[in-house]
Amino acid sequence: MWDDLSQYIINLAMENSKRTGWNTKIVEIGVGRFQSISNRLQENENIEVIMTDINPSNENVVKDDIFNPSMSLYENTDILFSIRPPAEIQKAIMDLRDELNCTLIIKPLFNEDLNIELKKMKLKNHGRASFYIYEGEN
């Protein structure tokens, strides 16, 4: 499942880089100790990855509070994603996405609903991965 989600994000990033001519900047919010997706994304030379968490687990993770984000960290972000974010931070993640006008991917817990009001995130299935994506109003 995680390989399928990683590959979907890589494909999205490659499309973005091809369209813009620039590397794709991806920020993972609330990375915790599960860093395998961001680590896989970093293997691609066309992708710049920043991992954030309120309590960084190592030196590769930047300390940031989603309720008071350090906006300079997120400048020029193309894709935000979060794996199993608690319901209480999901609205703050969407608010940041709205400010940045970028793609948002959220992979909730298997049996959890999203807690994002008034936004129509699309359920996406890619291989064995199921997640929600929001690219703005169409």
Give, region by region, the residue ranges found by the protein language model.
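A short acidic, Gly/Pro-enriched loop at the edge of an enzyme's catalytic core
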Residues: 71-79
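C-terminal substrate-binding/active-site "lid" region of AdoMet-derived donor-dependent transferases
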Residues: 87-138
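Conserved class I S-adenosyl-L-methionine
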Residues: 21-33
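S-adenosyl-L-methionine
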Residues: 1-22
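Residues in the short beta-alpha loop(s) of Rossmann-like NAD(P)-binding domains
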Residues: 32, 55, 110
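Conserved S-adenosyl-L-methionine
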Residues: 42-48, 99-101
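Conserved SAM-binding loop of SAM-dependent methyltransferases across substrates and taxa
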Residues: 33-45
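Adenosine-cofactor binding site in Rossmann-like domains, unifying the SAM/SAH pocket
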Residues: 51-72
